């Protein structure tokens, strides 16, 4: 979209992929799975599937000696691994919902970046910027690999460039960043019971 001194771009994409694991390389070994069923497109357990959704937008407004721009985006990464329910601990029951979902991760990412460029003279250029990102990861499945977490980061910057001619330039700047992350604790009661049965405290 372009109107006078303002222009913007928008992009969206979605990628889906489903891959089977080599029989016997994951989950419960089963000799029957080594037999060819005649269907080259048939993906049975165990398998993994990934869906990646991304939306980005860029905005820019220019007037006189000032250029203001911003980039904003959202990403959703959803990964699942499916395998016939199996466990190393005899006390772990079959899940009531999605009993064959071994692992699942749902990562949401929100990002933004804003920059203000000032052209004070033909030789001097100043840039002020701010960017931030927020992530939230949730999990499910009867196995555990990565924890749930919330992550936030942000930063401010100032950059100055001196360009006396077309062959020489000097740049200097400063940046400040701040970030936090909260990782949820994960307790595996079935593992604890198993270890206690093995004599561990």
Which residues does each PLM region occupy?
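Outer-membrane beta-barrel proteins, especially TonB-dependent receptors
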Residues: 1-201
């Amino acid at each position: 979209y372009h109107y006078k001194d303002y222009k913007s771009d928008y992009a969206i994409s979605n990628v889906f992929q489903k891959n089977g694991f080599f029989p016997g390389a994951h989950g419960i070994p089963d000799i029957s799975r080594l037999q060819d069923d005649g269907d080259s497109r048939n993906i049975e357990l165990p398998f993994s599937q990934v869906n990646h959704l991304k939306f980005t937008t860029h905005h820019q407004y220019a007037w006189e000696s000032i250029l203001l721009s911003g980039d904003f985006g959202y990403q959703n990464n959803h990964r699942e691994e499916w395998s016939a329910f199996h466990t190393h601990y005899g006390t772990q029951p079959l899940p009531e919902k999605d009993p064959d979902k071994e692992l699942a991760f749902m990562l949401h990412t929100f990002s933004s970046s804003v920059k203000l460029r000032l052209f004070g003279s033909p030789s001097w250029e100043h840039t002020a910027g701010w960017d931030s990102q927020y992530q939230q990861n949730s999990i499910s499945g009867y196995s555990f690999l990565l924890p749930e977490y919330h992550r936030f980061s942000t930063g401010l910057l100032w950059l100055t460039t001196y360009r006396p001619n077309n062959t020489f330039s000097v740049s200097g700047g400063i940046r400040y960043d701040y970030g936090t992350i909260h990782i949820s604790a994960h307790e595996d009661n079935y593992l604890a019971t198993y270890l206690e049965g093995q004599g561990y405290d």
